[in-house]
Amino acid sequence: MKNLFLFCRAGYEKECAAEIQQRAAEMNVGGFVKTTNNDAYVIYQCFEDDGADTLAKMLPLNSLIFARQMFAASELHSDLPEQDRVGPLVASLLEADVTKCGELRVETPDTNEAKELSAFCRKFTVPLRQGLKKVGVLLDKENGRRPIIHVCFVGPGKAYVGYSLSNNSSPHFMGIPRLRMAADAPSRSSLKLDEAFGAFLTKEEQEMRCRSGLKAVDLGACPGGWTYQLVRRGMMVAAVDNGPMDEKLMETGQVKHYRADGFRFEPPRKNIYWLVCDMVEKPSRVAELMEAWAINGWFKEAIFNLKLPMKSRYKEVRVILDTMGEIFKENEIDYRLQCKHLYHDRDEVTVHLWIFPEKGVSYAEMG
């Protein structure tokens, strides 16, 4: 297939397009982007007939900042006949030799206009699933190890059809995790950290590295949205902020409130596992703070937000992440770095930093 379909947040098409253009070029998969502002998706059209297949297989989705989900796609079906919408979509998959898939997702971009098609998509899934099973494109039973068929309706009668590989795909419909806001969470920002843990760590990794007894620091904690997520996972938290903290959080006995500036705070003990930070500040300044903590060896893993500028957002993030990498190498710090524009992020990205990952969890245990 020649087209790579990428879901993103509406308004971030340019960033998603710039990123896929750069990453595809690094992999020698030539092509060009097609996108429209606020459509919430980007098409990367490859010059080679199998270019999108290469990207769907070899370009890790979790290495992309602005794409929520991606799949190798056909050309746009721009006028699907009302009397038979199934036939052309099935034919496209057969022509591309897509068979024995384990799941079907009929989706739309994440815009109010496209979501008006959601009811139709749910109804259409039934006859489409039957049609795909009949010709062997879809297995009779769901199989989480097989490719996933995607049909994305971008308008009435207009759809892209294709596939993603189960080991390089978001497990979530449209790439959007469905998280519930806890009634006792101090603020909606709590969902950002909840989503971040799920985005950057598997369930098994969370059980090992987000467990009860670990020490954590939350810089810029007030009123406690991010602290809440650490507390509910059983951690002991130093909440750093000049503002007031949520009373219920303080009553848990797991939080110590330091009335201080997050940029000047130094932890009294250095057995911290998690450092989290969601401060409204210049992204370069937050990055420098994380670099300083890493060089001092004050934490093991960090999740922090970088607020984005109005222009050149992808370029700015790329420069900051590359600079962090250079500084860590200069200081002989082994690290892993991931960055994602999460669903619950707005004009910001969330970064996960893991320092000396080969050392494991033990040295930062509560002691």
UniProtKB/Swiss-Prot annotation:
Keywords: Cytoplasm, Methyltransferase, rRNA processing, S-adenosyl-L-methionine, Transferase. S-adenosyl-L-methionine binds at S189, C222, P223, G224, G225, D241, D261, D278. One of its GO terms (biological process) is rRNA processing. Disulfide bonds: none annotated. It catalyses: cytidine(2498) in 23S rRNA + S-adenosyl-L-methionine = 2'-O-methylcytidine(2498) in 23S rRNA + S-adenosyl-L-homocysteine + H(+). It is found in: Cytoplasm. It comes from the Bacteria. Pfam families: FtsJ (PF01728), RlmM_FDX (PF18125), RLMM_N (PF21239). It is an enzyme of class 2 (transferase). Its EC number is 2.1.1.186. The active site is at K307 (proton acceptor). The keyword Cytoplasm applies. One of its GO terms (molecular function) is S-adenosylmethionine-dependent methyltransferase activity. Belongs to the class I-like SAM-binding methyltransferase superfamily. RNA methyltransferase RlmE family. RlmM subfamily. HAMAP family: 23SrRNA_methyltr_M (MF_01551). NCBIfam families: PRK11760.1. Monomer. Catalyzes the 2'-O-methylation at nucleotide C2498 in 23S rRNA. This is Ribosomal RNA large subunit methyltransferase M. It comes from Shewanella denitrificans (strain OS217 / ATCC BAA-1090 / DSM 15013).
